[in-house]
Amino acid sequence: VARKDEASFASPEDMKEPRPIYARVLSESERSPRNALIKIANSYFEGIEKNTGEIVPFHKDCNRYGNGTQTTNNPSTIAAGCREQFDNKVYSYITEVRNRRFLMADEEKGLVFGIFIFDMPGKKENFKYFPTPFDKLPTRFYKPRSLLLAEMFKIVDGQIISIEAVMVNVPFGAVSGW
């Protein structure tokens, strides 16, 4: 359950219908085998931990949605694209992605789905590169916390073109139920 008062971004009203991109069946030439799909999705989390987009195969038109809100290429949230956000260290406040569990990989549609935990200790130095100055951030950004996430990736031609995440805040260091 994503609630506006708990999440950094929340537009549950925009989650009523699946985005058409996720239903599209890929041509044979656009597909990746299951193990490659999981490796590509996992590179996203490696990129978060290492603060670089260099190791993540982002499609030039990649977009990410968090709790229904478009969090890339969107001037009202963060104007930068997927790769640019990583290269600009926008996620440097996330220090660990743990309990990674990939539950589904669909070669025909290029989808990977899993559940994960992001750890955010809330230390000022972790926000050095964040687009908003630390003293202007809402408390929810720098309060020590973890996020339980379910994320789905659309991968076409070996590149991540779309990411859909649903998340909820939990106490920092919370254990997973999986």
Where are these regions (language model features)?
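C-terminal and inter-domain tail/linker signature
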Residues: 1-178
